[in-house]
Each structure stands twice: as structure tokens, then as C-alpha cells.
Curated annotation (Swiss-Prot):
Region ranges (Interaction with tRNA): 150-152, 312-313
GO CC terms: cytoplasm
Superkingdom of this protein's organism: Bacteria
Protein family (similarity comment): Belongs to the MnmA/TRMU family.
Keywords from the named record: ATP-binding, Cytoplasm, Disulfide bond, Nucleotide-binding, RNA-binding, Transferase, tRNA processing, tRNA-binding
Region of interest (Interaction with target base in tRNA), ranges: 98-100
Binding annotation for ATP: 12-19, 38, 127
Name this polypeptide is given: tRNA-specific 2-thiouridylase MnmA
Subcellular location: Cytoplasm
Disulfide bonds: 103-200
NCBIfam families: PRK00143.1, trmU
Length: 375
């Protein structure tokens, strides 16, 4: 059996079952394991209970059970400056941001990784469902994990080679039910703990209410694409392209079909709405993305290649042709078939079969070379 005892691995422990089982597996494999809990947000809830404190209690219990040392580190300042300010700026600009991606690139796999390396760690391990593979040239590739249903490569898509080569994902060949079973058999207190959902700093709170505490909302008209006023919106930032819920609009003489958000006019502060799921205004055949990052390093020259892509987290891959512009690190992505509700601010993520190639941020979507008025 290989001797891993000289290899130090810092495990990011959230108090959840995934990172707990990650720590357990590494310990069983003989690594020198250290658990670290990160506090990113002062999340005292409406009843005055700080969920981070409860989570850290779980980390302590699990670490004691497994027999590993543990620490806690505060990254509230970094999180506030690099993730939350970006989140607010994007909403202000009418876009729909993805703070989880930013949290990974700027906090979990940057400040936290640096902290782990300062603790003399050889690797940082996380309980994400993702997989890495090192090729014969020593280059690390990002792969889809065994559990396709939990696949988190979408949120990791903007990490670099420098970051992923120091990272381990111990759950890469396990499914979530298998992870829960391992936790139960090992008697971990959080074996049945509920999965976290939604944006971490909002938790179970009402999204509109949360956002209104940070950004002043300016209400305006809801209009049809030909300019007819049909209602009032509470602030453009509360709506996302393709959204149906919460518009409060009923049937019309012409149609009983539900209403959907099909655009935003920031200048006029108007929300553009239309009846019917399949509005042609929602369908794009191309997008532009910036800040493109490839796990194996960005190509130095302009390139064109076929791939599959996701434009949002829970979506089946679609076939695309990518034209990458090396100087600006931007890409034009042409879809094999028109795609619905491609939303500026969300991430574009590219795949080649089982491999996740990388991604960027969606800036604009087009149909027949005409830019859709989505922000
Ligand atoms: N507060 C935290 N401190 C340290 N590491 C964290 C923290 N939050 C998340 N992580 C790390 O990031 C991974 C993915 O985070 P995510 O929020 O997606 O959790 P999850 O899939 O619900 O996992 P878990 O069951 O471990 O909470 C976690 O498994 C853990 O390794």
C-alpha cells in the first residue's frame, strides 16, 4: 500500500456531509489530513441564530470522530469585496450573476488555497462533485464526476491550471447516495443533514427582500414588445430572462397563455414581457463571452473547434462551434440549434465528452446577427 502519510491535505469542511466524507476517505487513505472551516458571511438569521456557528459545531464533531485536527478561518472581508460587490454590480447592470463561480475562483480556490499552502499542505481537498485527471505530460484536466446529477463542474469552470493542479475531489467516483451511506456507516453526525440550496449568503431567505436591503429598487412599466403597458414591475433586477413566476399578469382577450420576461430596457427602466413560453425573442443562435479560461491553459492563437456547452447550471449540453479570440480572451459561440433564454451574466461552460474544457461569462446573445435586448 502507498504511504500517503507525508502528504498533507487541507480539506475545506463546511459541516455538510460531502466535505465530511471527503475528509474521512482521505484519512482512511493515510493522508495527513487537516480540516478547515471557512467563515465567509455573517449569516445570523431572523431568529438571531448564526448558521455558520452551527456548521462549525458539526465540523468539530466530525473532525473529532475521524481523528483529525481542525481550524477555522475568516474570509468575510475577501468574500464581501470580491464576490458580493461583483454580485451587486451585476444586478445593478440588469444582469443575472453567478456568485458561486466567483466564490470558487476568488475565495475557495484562491484565498483559501493560499491559506492551505501556508499550512504546508500539498493539496486542498473539497467535497465538490467533480473529477481531475493528470495526463502523461503532467497537465491536470477537469472531468465530469461519476454522479452526473450532482455534477458541479459548471461552478468550477473558471479555475486555472495553477488552481486545479493543487486540488483533490475525493468524491469524484461516488454518487450522493453512496456518500450518505459511507457517512452513516461511519457514524458521522451529519449523515442525514439537508443539502444546502440556493445562493449561500441568501440561504432560505426571500431573495427580493434580501436584494432590496442592498440595492434601491426602482419600479417601472411592464410592456409588450410593441410598447403596450400591461403592468408594473418592482425593479428590473428582480427579474431574469425567461422567467414566468411573479409577474402577476393574467389572460388577455387574445390569449390565455402565461406571460414570460423576454427582455429588459435599462434606459427606459422597462421590463419587456410576452405571452407564451416559446417567444422567438427568447431564442438565440449565438452568444458572446468574455473572460474565457481553459483548464489546460488558454490557446495562444485564435482557434475554432466543436464542443458542447451549458449556458446555465441545470441544462442539457447543446452542440456548439466555438471561435476563440486569443488577444481578448473572448469567444463567439454558435449553437447547432437555437437556445432559449441565454442570459447575460450567467456562465458559458464548454465540454468535450467527459472533459470540462473551461468557460467564460455570457455578455450578449444574438439571433440572425441581431443582438437580443436582454439587458
Ligand atoms: N464554509 C466552508 N468552509 C470550508 N469549506 C467549505 C465551506 N463551504 C463549502 N466548502 C467546500 O466547498 C465544497 C462545495 O460546497 P457546496 O456549498 O457546494 O457544498 P455541498 O455540496 O453542499 O457540500 P457539503 O455537503 O460538504 O456542504 C464543500 O464540500 C466543501 O469542501
Amino acid at each position: 500500500m502507498v504511504d500517503n502519510s507525508k502528504i498533507r491535505v487541507v480539506v475545506g469542511m463546511s459541516g455538510g456531509v460531502d466535505s465530511s466524507v471527503s475528509a474521512l476517505l482521505l484519512k482512511q487513505q493515510g493522508y495527513d489530513v487537516v480540516g478547515v472551516f471557512m467563515k465567509n458571511w455573517d449569516d445570523t438569521n431572523d431568529d438571531g441564530v448564526c448558521t455558520a456557528t452551527e456548521d462549525y459545531e458539526d465540523v468539530k464533531k466530525v473532525a473529532d470522530k475521524i481523528g483529525i485536527p481542525y481550524y477555522s478561518i475568516n474570509f468575510e472581508k475577501e468574500y464581501w469585496e470580491r464576490v458580493f460587490q461583483y454580485f451587486l454590480k451585476e444586478y445593478k447592470a440588469g444582469r443575472t450573476p453567478n456568485p458561486d463561480i466567483m466564490c470558487n475562483t476568488e475565495v475557495k480556490f484562491k484565498s483559501f488555497l493560499e491559506y492551505a499552502l501556508d499550512l504546508d499542505a500539498d493539496y486542498l481537498a473539497m467535497g465538490h462533485y467533480a473529477k481531475t485527471m493528470v495526463d502523461e505530460n503532467g497537465v491536470t484536466h477537469m472531468m465530469r464526476p461519476k454522479d452526473g446529477n450532482k455534477d458541479q463542474t459548471y461552478f468550477l469552470s473558471q479555475l486555472t491550471q495553477e488552481q486545479i493542479k493543487r486540488v483533490m475531489f475525493p468524491l469524484q467516483d461516488l454518487t450522493k447516495p453512496e456518500v450518505r451511506r459511507i457517512a452513516e456507516e461511519a457514524g458521522l453526525v451529519n449523515a442525514k443533514k439537508k443539502d444546502s440550496t440556493g445562493i449561500c449568503f441568501i440561504g432560505e431567505r426571500n431573495f427580493k427582500h434580501f436584494l432590496s436591503e442592498f440595492l434601491p429598487a426602482q419600479g417601472g412599466d411592464m410592456v409588450t414588445p410593441d410598447g403596450k403597458v400591461v403592468g408594473h414591475h418592482a425593479g428590473l433586477m428582480y427579474y431574469t430572462i425567461g422567467q414566468r413566476q411573479g409577474l402577476g399578469l393574467g389572460s388577455t382577450k387574445e390569449s390565455t397563455a402565461p406571460w414570460f420576461v423576454v427582455g429588459k430596457d435599462l434606459e427606459k427602466n422597462q421590463l419587456i414581457v410576452e405571452q407564451g413560453y416559446d417567444s422567438p425573442r427568447l431564442y438565440a443562435d449565438r452568444l458572446q463571452a468574455s473572460g474565457m479560461t481553459f483548464f489546460t491553459g488558454n490557446p495562444e492563437e485564435d482557434t475554432e473547434f466543436k464542443a458542447t456547452a451549458k449556458f446555465r447550471y441545470r441544462q442539457c449540453d447543446v452542440g456548439v462551434t466555438v471561435k476563440y479570440h486569443a488577444a481578448s480572451k473572448t469567444a463567439d459561440v454558435y449553437f447547432d440549434e437555437p437556445a432559449r433564454a441565454v442570459t447575460p451574466g450567467q456562465a458559458l461552460v464548454l465540454y468535450n465528452g467527459e472533459e470540462c474544457l473551461g468557460g467564460g461569462n455570457i455578455d450578449a446573445a444574438f439571433k440572425d446577427d441581431k443582438k437580443l435586448q436582454l439587458v
